[in-house]
Each structure stands twice: as structure tokens, then as C-alpha cells.
């Protein structure tokens, strides 16, 4: 379901971005999707007719989160941050941020490994900034920036997961490739070179396949343009101006006492290092697919920034790593929704037109990776659009 809406949003993005030059769309693709486009435009148009939204049910949210901690033991703890009318209206911590090796109470300033929520908040936002400055175009070919890359892949294919690339490459597989090439130590340049030359399961534009490799590729495009690593660029271009002093990759040692640990392997808990093996081992912690650390309030600040972008830029942004959907509101009409989840137990859902967002950060994989967070996420999302 999410994949189909991403595709719809991609088409809408083209129409809005190039409305004076619709011929850029291939005629066959346009005619094939005409009915879908009309329906999507109708949904978005009706979203603007929504009346004032019902206040977020904070007490009910507290209840479902506490049940997940105390009754169902799905998570050790969580931080919930709610944005209403473009401002943070609620920030609450629950349970514990650590239970192994010792119990530590959760605090609202706890720093989380965002996992795949790094895609929209990191590489996706970086690409969005560069597009707004005219330094990058969604129709640019990736090979313009990474010469050895597949020649038919455009930036838009990376953003919308239509590149045809595999979903993932395990650290074990990459390690074997490195050894075969005589490379003894994992280095990011060898990882991107392997991605650039890998066999693709499907042709470009043929099939939606969510892929971490797309956003590692996007990261390297960004770095080629700005001339520095994405961590440095985003810290000073976006995170610090938003007041997000701790947001970014590779958190400082001085912040470790505020970081929520993730999975414990052989009695050693991952703390301060990204949980994702591809990002941690093969990209040495700075990766487009994962690795951003932040507090719930910092993610909310990012969401507010995103909601205040011009509509056309925002729609491009929904394609820059965010799932897109049209959800029903309390009035029975529709509004655009952007959302993304992270493997460690993180999620962000944004309703840009209503200036509302819900950020739920948990360390679901602590101390063991064995619980499903989908019911809790679904319950909170339903509260966002009662």
C-alpha cells in the first residue's frame, strides 16, 4: 500500500514541479496513470477543506504507550512528542531507556538511534536543500556525480525507491567481496563502488523496492556536490540552525550518558554506534540509510521545518525518503500524510496541511531484537487523525 502511494506522489511531484512543461512526462506513463493522478489531486484538494483538527488525545496516548511497556513488555521505554498547529504541544518520557546492564530511567532529552528515520531527516533533507538551491535536480543522472554508477538511474529513482537496486547488502556479503578484491578493511568508498556496479533485480522505474542502497547512493551524491561529508554539511546547514545541538551522525562521547542503547550482543550493548550493520561496519557510522542520532524534540523541530516548506518543495520532500499517503480526517475528507519508521523502534508521522506530527522514539531492540511495534505505531497514528 505504501509503495503505491509513493508512486502516486512521484507523479504528482512531476506535475507540480514541471507544470509549465508537462511534456517532460512520457506520454504513455501519463495516460496510463491519468485516473490515479486525478484521484490523488482530488484527495489533496479536499485536504485543504479540513476544519480545525481535534486536539491530540494525550491521555489515551499515555495509556497505550504505558501498556506497551508495562503490560505487553514490547519496549523498555519511549519518548512521545506531538506537534499541533506547527508547535510542540506535548513531550513525555515513559519507562526506561536502558534495562541492561543497569536500569536507567527514560528522559525527554534521551538521544536515540533513528535507524531508517535517518533517510528523510538526513540524506533526503540534504537532497531537498540542494534542489531548492538549484545545485541538484531530481532528473539528474546519478552517474553525473558517481561516474561508475548505473547509467540509467536518476536522482528521483533513488528518492522513490525505483532504482531497481537490491533492498540491502549484508556486511558479511560485502566483507567477502572486499576480501576477493584484496581490500582488508571496510571503507565507504568500496561500499559505494560495489553498489554502483551491483546486479539489479529489476530494471530502473519498473518496480518499487525499498532499498537502503538508494539512500547510501543519495548520500554520496550530496557529498560530491557539497565537497564535505554529509554529517558536517547537515549539522551546520540544517540541524544547528534548527537548534538541534545533538542531532547528527557519530554522537560525541560526552553525550553517551544520554543515549538509549540498542541491541545487546554477547552481553555487550550497542551504545553510541548505529545499530544497522551496513551503516556501522561498512559505512563506518556515517550512512545515508541510517546513523542519525537525535532526541524526540529535535525530530519535532525537523518536522516543523518540513511542514513550513513551500508546498511544491514539501511534496518533493515527501518523496525524499518519506512514505506518502492520503489519510481520512475527522471531517471525512482527506489530507496528505508523510511518514517513516526505523528498525530500532522510531517513527515520525506528519500531516503538513494540518501542521500536525507525532514522533515516537523507542529502543525496541533493547536488550533483544524480538518485538513488533506495529500495533503501537498504528494506534498513535489513528489518534493523529481521529
Segments from the language model and where they lie:
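Bacterial Sec-dependent N-terminal signal peptides
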Residues: 1-55
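Short, conserved catalytic-motif segment at the N-terminal edge
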Residues: 55-112, 135-139, 197
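Short, surface-exposed beta-strand/loop micro-motifs that present aromatic residues
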Residues: 337, 344-357
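A short acidic/small-residue loop/turn micro-motif
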Residues: 95-99, 310, 365-367
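Short active-site loop at a secondary-structure junction
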Residues: 72-79, 101-158, 202-213, 287-290, ...
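Residue-level preference for non-acidic, small/hydrophobic
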Residues: 65-66, 80, 86, 123, ...
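Short, surface-exposed loop or secondary-structure junction motifs
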Residues: 153-336
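Short, gly/Ser/Thr-rich active-site loops of penicillin-recognizing serine hydrolases
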Residues: 311-316, 327-332, 367-386
